[in-house]
């Protein structure tokens, strides 16, 4: 099933059940009306449904994946993880921890390891679940996500 973002239909996402030991879901992003269905972003997702343990479990899994990726991708520029407010949530009650493994100096093509914890108002509005995501984004998709998807 195609799902669109709140402010733009330039890309859509399809989420597939995966249920492996590593990820619950696999998410693909494709440019709308692309007759070749070229994947612009692909992510593995783990959901954390228990708010009482989310942050602790997030950080444990986040650190484990980061350790593995950092040793495998040591030639890439790797950002430091910090707890930051999720810009899309205007209440300021949603947070994310994100690390970027950049393929170029422009920061436009990268692997992204992130955890998102939603505030109660944002959760009630969109029904998004706290999650960890490991994904690769193309340059075009990255630009769209940062500048158009949540305007």
Predicted ranges, named:
Residues 1-38, 150-151:
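N-terminal leader/targeting segments
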Residues 2-3, 9-10, 21, 35, ...:
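Intrinsically disordered, low-complexity segments enriched in small/polar residues
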Residues 5-6, 17, 52, 95, ...:
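Generic detection of intrinsically disordered/low-complexity segments and helix-coil linkers/edges
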Residues 15-16, 27, 107, 140, ...:
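Prokaryotic Sec-type signal peptides and long signal-anchor helices
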Residues 20-94:
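Long, charged/polar, surface-exposed segments that mediate recognition or autoinhibition
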Residues 55-57, 125-130, 146-150:
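Surface-exposed beta-strand edges and their flanking turn/coil or helix-capping segments
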Residues 60-140:
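A charged, solvent-exposed segment within the mature domains of Sec-exported extracytoplasmic proteins
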Residues 135-136, 144-148:
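Soluble, non-transmembrane alpha-helical interaction regions
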């Amino acid at each position: 099933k195609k799902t669109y973002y709140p402010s733009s239909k330039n890309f859509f996402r399809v989420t597939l059940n995966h249920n492996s030991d590593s990820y619950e879901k696999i998410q693909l992003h494709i440019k709308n009306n692309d007759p070749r269905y070229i994947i612009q972003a692909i992510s593995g997702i783990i959901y954390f449904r228990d708010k009482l343990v989310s942050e602790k479990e997030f950080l444990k899994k986040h650190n484990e994946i980061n350790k593995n990726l950092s040793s495998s991708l040591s030639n890439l520029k790797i950002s430091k993880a910090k707890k930051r407010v999720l810009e899309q949530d205007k209440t300021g009650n949603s947070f994310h921890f994100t690390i970027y493994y950049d393929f170029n100096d422009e920061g436009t093509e990268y692997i992204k390891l992130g955890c998102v914890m939603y505030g109660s108002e944002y959760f009630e509005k969109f029904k998004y679940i706290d999650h960890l995501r490991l994904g690769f984004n193309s340059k075009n998709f990255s630009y769209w996500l940062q500048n158009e998807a949540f305007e």
